[in-house]
């Protein structure tokens, strides 16, 4: 269903960091370059996967969700709202506690109001820590989360809301495709 994405995952390098096998991929790391055909295939797949009915914003987290959200935006004319790693101190700014399997930090939401119908897209979900923080903050604002989609699902993340993905992978000394959405 996603031949360019699947081939790029099957051929991407694996880097060992301590006990962790880390896959290095254009969509998750920007290394090597992000091929336009890959990005187009992903955007088309995500548009088919997501409920975009009456959505005000495509929301994504800085940094690697940005190319995905932008490609979807260009195809749908739905504006992108980026959850940033920098605090701007603007009125209505909302903090997000970001906890991943390997780090902890803060992110910041701006420009989303009560009643805004949004979809969230991102490159990869592993543990669900970052996304659960984003969901909690968006719900506290009063945003309506219409849908959540990821390009890649890795492992068995624990997420507070239903979500979809294009491909599910397992990473050992190589990437193995578990399944794909259709």
From Swiss-Prot:
InterPro entries xrefs? HGPRTase-like (IPR026597), PRibTrfase_dom (IPR000836), PRTase-like (IPR029057), Pur/Pyrimidine_PRTase (IPR050118)
Tell me what reaction this enzyme catalyses: IMP + diphosphate = hypoxanthine + 5-phospho-alpha-D-ribose 1-diphosphate; GMP + diphosphate = guanine + 5-phospho-alpha-D-ribose 1-diphosphate
Record PANTHER family: HYPOXANTHINE/GUANINE PHOSPHORIBOSYLTRANSFERASE, XANTHINE PHOSPHORIBOSYLTRANSFERASE
Query: Which pathway does this chain act in?
Result: Purine metabolism; IMP biosynthesis via salvage pathway; IMP from hypoxanthine: step 1/1
The subcellular location is:
Cytoplasm
Q: What is its main location?
A: cytoplasm
Q: Name one GO cellular component term.
A: cytoplasm
Q: How does it assemble?
A: Homodimer.
By sequence similarity, the record places it as follows: Belongs to the purine/pyrimidine phosphoribosyltransferase family. Archaeal HPRT subfamily.
Keyword annotations of the record? Cytoplasm, Glycosyltransferase, Purine salvage, Transferase
Gene Ontology MF, one: guanine phosphoribosyltransferase activity
> What is the name listed in the Swiss-Prot or TrEMBL entry for this protein?
Hypoxanthine/guanine phosphoribosyltransferase
* Enzyme Commission numbers on file: 2.4.2.8
Per the UniProt entry, what are the Gene Ontology biological process annotations, in alphabetical order? IMP salvage; purine ribonucleoside salvage
Q: What does this protein do?
A: Catalyzes a salvage reaction resulting in the formation of IMP that is energically less costly than de novo synthesis.
Q: CDD domains of this UniProt entry?
A: PRTases_typeI
Query: Does Transmembrane helix show up as a keyword for this record?
Result: no
